[in-house]
Design a protein with these regions (language model features):
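Non-catalytic cap/lid and distal C-terminal segments of serine-dependent acyl enzymes
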Residues: 1-182
Length: 182
């Protein structure tokens, strides 16, 4: 097919998602530093871990959101608290929920974590896993996707992405390698 996709960050995730959702329709995707494609590493945070928290690591230290040359620029908690001031329509963390979360009262997305404590809602994450975790989708559907998808994903990511997007991308690469994908 002559339909090709590319995108960076959120656009990179969209390119990946479209390619794995419509493998017969699309001829290939070239995502760069896509938003998290494996929720075992969501900006560094394992959303599937028991008692997962987006503000604090298991040792109590803050989860960083952005870095430069190895130095933390901002923590997830500080960034999210600024977003709360803007309201439910503004900000990166809210945008993940608008894309991935089921709809709740009034059509708003169900929050994936408590904005006060940082505690992850495992029921919401189960929905995310079922519907939007790209690596999980490949694991579940590779036998049926292989013929139409193999060799069509051309992922590019560095080793120290500013927003920790490299971790999930490398997990996705490992998933693809484990499946024998080209």
């Amino acid at each position: 097919s002559g339909r090709l996709l590319t995108g960076h960050s959120s656009g990179g995730w969209a390119a990946l998602w479209l390619q794995v959702t419509y493998p017969k329709l699309l001829g290939g995707a070239w995502p760069t530093s896509p938003d998290p494609s494996d929720f075992h590493d969501f900006l560094g945070i394992n959303l599937y871990a028991p008692n997962a928290n987006v503000y604090r690591k298991p040792d109590g230290t803050p989860w960083p959101l952005a870095r430069d040359k190895g130095e933390m620029l901002v923590a997830v908690e500080d960034f999210t608290r600024r977003e709360v001031v803007v309201g439910e329509y503004g900000g990166q963390m809210a945008s993940f929920e608008w894309v991935f979360s089921p709809r709740g009262a009034g059509g708003l997305p169900v929050p994936m974590f408590d904005r006060t404590t940082g505690a992850v809602d495992s029921a919401v994450i189960a929905y995310w896993k079922e519907h939007y975790d790209v690596a999980e989708r490949l694991h579940r559907h590779w036998p049926e996707f292989r013929r139409d998808l193999d060799g069509k994903i051309h992922l590019t990511v560095g080793s120290a992405d500013t927003f920790y997007l490299d971790g999930a991308a490398h997990l996705l690469e490992a998933t693809m390698k484990g499946l024998g994908a080209k």
